[in-house]
């Protein structure tokens, strides 16, 4: 009976170790994907701000110097 218990524990242990490793790799993959998404959103924000500053600069040049102070 003790032999069966030891065998069962061994089988369960050997099954849980790969499961744990797979979960860890899955979490790492999700973290990498989140970082890529964050980097892409930062790039988009940078492009939008550059575009906005360029457009306002062009409109200022076309409008005769921009807004006039009152």
From Swiss-Prot:
Source species of the chain: Phyllomedusa sauvagei (Sauvage's leaf frog)
Main localization, broad class: secreted
GO annotations of cellular component type: extracellular region
Signal peptide: 1-22
Name of this protein: Plasticin-S1
Family per similarity comment: Belongs to the frog skin active peptide (FSAP) family. Plasticin subfamily.
Source superkingdom: Eukaryota
Function, in words: The native peptide is a cationic amphipathic alpha-helical antimicrobial peptide with potent activity against both Gram-positive and Gram-negative bacteria. It has weak activity against fungi and shows low hemolytic activity.
Propeptide cleavage-removed residue intervals: 23-45
Record remark on domains: Plasticins have huge conformational plasticity. They can display random coil, alpha-helical, beta-sheet or beta-harpin structures.
Cellular localization per UniProt: Secreted
Expression sites (tissue/organ): Expressed by the skin glands.
Entry keywords, A to Z: Cleavage on pair of basic residues, Secreted, Signal
Segments of this protein annotated with the region Disordered: 25-45
InterPro entries from the UniProt entry: Frog_antimicrobial_propeptide, FSAP
The keyword 4Fe-4S belongs to this UniProt entry's keyword annotation: no
One Pfam family in the UniProt entry: FSAP_sig_propep
């Amino acid at each position: 009976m003790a032999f069966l218990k030891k065998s069962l524990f061994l089988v369960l242990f050997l099954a849980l170790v790969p499961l744990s490793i797979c979960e860890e790799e899955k979490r790492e993959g999700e973290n990498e994907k989140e970082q890529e998404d964050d980097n892409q959103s930062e790039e988009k924000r940078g492009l939008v701000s550059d575009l906005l500053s360029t457009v306002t600069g062009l409109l200022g040049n076309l409008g005769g110097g921009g807004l006039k102070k009152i």
